[in-house]
Structure formats: C-alpha cells, structure tokens
C-alpha cells in the first residue's frame, strides 16, 4: 500500500517515498491469551528506603488496563508472592503492601501454573515483577529459607519450574 501511494504521488518514473505515503496496519489478533501477573511483595521491595513496590504496582496496573482495553477477550489474573503466594483481585492491586517476607518464587510459579491450568485457551503467559533473587520455598520438611546469596537448592527448583513452563509453551 505504501509503495502504491508513493507511485501515485511521485509518478512512475521517479519513486520518492514520503511520510504521507506510508500506511501502517494495526492488525487485530483474534486469538485469546490467558496471562498471570506475579508481583513480589518481599521485604526487599522497600529495603534500604528504596520503594520498588510503587513502580511495580504502576506497571501492573498499566498492564491490566492495556490487556482489558486492547484485548477484552483475554484474561488476566494477578498473584502476589512473598513467603507464600496468593491470588489478588484487580481492585486490590493499588493497595498491595510489602511485608516482612522472603521471596518464594517457586510458590508463585506453582500458583501461576494452577491458575493457567484452569484456563481453556491454549495461549498462556506469565509475567513476573520482582527485584531480586528467590530466597525461600516450601519443602516436605517445612519452610526452607536462605537470604544470603543465591541458594542452589532454591534456584534448581526455580529452573525446574522454568523448564516446566517451556514444556507447556508458557513464555
């Protein structure tokens, strides 16, 4: 379409493409997407006086608004994760608070998978808003935590979840 406009405006012998000739198509996809948005509410989101939770909530609210207005047939679920993961409603998102929690990324991913498993459409994705490293998880022996550096045991479980997501075509 852009080349056709350029030919019409400049003539066949001398092709000059001007900005008025350019046509941009905004295609509308009919496929539906199920999205889970994970938000870290661990203590480090406000540690040392640095407020990371407010920008995280703003990004989350912008993403929700974008999906709800641009893709009204899509679904978006939100969960928070600290020591535990729990679903939160969109209306409660602005009031989300950081707690004296660690970062249980494994629990967050497990809950995200549970939510997506219940969705009927095939297109699924997970977004995670976090400031750092996973520092705890539940094991058969109880609550395991390690805030000092990267813990190989916790990281391995996170990587296992990432492989599971890839296997299930969840980016």
Q: Which residues make up each language-model segment?
A:
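Acidic, polar low-complexity linker/tail segments
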Residues: 1-36, 43-50, 72
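…and closely analogous acidic/polar surface helices at protein-protein or active-site interfaces
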Residues: 28-34, 43-78, 97-104, 116-117, ...
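Structural motif
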Residues: 34-36, 123-127
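Active-site metal-binding loops of divalent metal-dependent hydrolases
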Residues: 41, 132
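Short beta-strand-loop
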Residues: 72-102, 114-119, 137-142
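Hydrophobic anchor at the start of a short beta-strand
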Residues: 76, 124, 171
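Von Willebrand factor type A / integrin I
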Residues: 119-121, 133-136, 140-171
């Amino acid at each position: 379409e852009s080349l056709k406009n350029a030919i019409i405006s400049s003539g066949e012998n001398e092709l000059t493409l001007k900005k008025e000739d350019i046509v941009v198509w905004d295609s509308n996809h009919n496929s539906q997407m199920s999205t889970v948005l994970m938000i870290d509410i661990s203590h480090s989101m406000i540690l040392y006086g640095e407020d990371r939770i407010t920008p995280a909530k703003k990004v989350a609210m912008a993403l929700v608004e974008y999906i709800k207005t641009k893709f009204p047939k899509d679904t978006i679920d939100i969960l928070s994760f600290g020591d535990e993961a729990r679903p939160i409603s969109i209306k409660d998102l602005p009031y989300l608070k950081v707690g004296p929690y660690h970062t249980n990324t494994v629990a967050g991913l497990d809950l995200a998978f549970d939510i997506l498993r219940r969705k009927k459409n095939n297109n699924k994705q997970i977004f995670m808003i976090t400031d750092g490293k996973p520092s705890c998880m539940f094991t058969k022996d109880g609550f395991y935590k390690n805030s000092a550096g990267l813990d190989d045991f916790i990281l391995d479980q996170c990587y296992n979840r990432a492989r599971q997501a890839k296997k299930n075509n969840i980016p």
